[in-house]
């Protein structure tokens, strides 16, 4: 029960309770991740303990921000193997989670996980972030856009802020050192209709890892010119 106790402690740290039923869903998720990872590149993290800490607990820590408890709709942009979107959906069944990924094989995996876990509050979409944000049913439609993708804040802001409603939030799950990155993304955040609200440090149980939740509030509409076409966002970040 070591992992259960560890995850319970992590959940309690952010004001949540982890039920046995929720824990069992996480274990099924872990097993599917390990099984599928042998044929589809989903994660470099494959050991039980590492998955629990670096994927599950890291995702649960998003709830340190009350926005994740209060939001009705969330989009996880570039979700990959489903982080943080699926853990968020497991912990809060009142939030409707949209998982967005550009690789069809990963979307197939996400659909399987959603089915096996019986998650009625999750839908997976196959699309590039730049393309999805131009769809009327997705653009400026979510209380939260989140991402744990490996990209700098300027790039992530252009990928994510177009999905956020006015007065909603873009919340990025970042590593330990974000100060310089935040400074460099100031123009991008402002241009895209956002305002930096907070940088919130979180600790991962039973590790020395410290991560940051970067919180951006959407204060005005995103200009129609954004996001730019595929490729331009990463090649020429807004500076």
Swiss-Prot record:
Q: Where in the cell is it found?
A: Cytoplasm
**Lineage top rank: taxon:** Bacteria
Q: How would you classify this enzyme at the top EC level?
A: transferase
List keywords of the entry alphabetically.
Cytoplasm, Methyltransferase, rRNA processing, S-adenosyl-L-methionine, Transferase
Q: What does this protein do?
A: Specifically methylates the N7 position of a guanine in 16S rRNA.
Q: Which family does it belong to?
A: Belongs to the methyltransferase superfamily. RNA methyltransferase RsmG family.
**Name of the protein:** Ribosomal RNA small subunit methyltransferase G
């Amino acid at each position: 029960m070591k992992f259960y106790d560890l995850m319970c402690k992590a959940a309690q740290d952010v004001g949540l309770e982890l039920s046995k039923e929720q824990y069992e869903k996480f274990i099924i998720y872990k097993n599917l991740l390990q099984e599928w990872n042998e044929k589809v590149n989903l994660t470099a993290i494959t050991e039980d303990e590492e998955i629990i800490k670096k994927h599950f607990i890291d995702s649960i820590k998003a709830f340190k921000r009350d926005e994740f408890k209060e939001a009705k709709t969330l989009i996880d942009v570039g979700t990959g193997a489903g982080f943080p979107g699926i853990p968020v959906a497991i912990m809060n069944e009142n939030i409707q989670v949209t998982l967005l990924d550009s690789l069809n094989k990963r979307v197939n995996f996400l659909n399987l996980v959603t089915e096996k876990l019986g998650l009625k509050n999750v839908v997976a979409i196959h699309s590039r972030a730049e393309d999805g944000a131009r769809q009327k049913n997705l653009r400026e439609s979510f209380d939260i856009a989140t991402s744990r993708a490996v990209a700098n804040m300027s790039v992530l802001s252009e990928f994510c802020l177009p999905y956020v409603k006015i007065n909603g939030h873009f919340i990025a799950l970042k590593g330990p050192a974000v100060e310089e990155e935040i400074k460099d993304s100031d123009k991008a955040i402002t241009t895209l209709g956002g305002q930096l609200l907070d940088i919130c440090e979180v600790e991962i149980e039973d590790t020395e890892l410290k991560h940051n939740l970067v919180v951006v509030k959407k204060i005005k509409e995103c200009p129609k010119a954004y996001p730019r076409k595929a490729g331009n966002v990463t090649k020429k970040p807004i500076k």
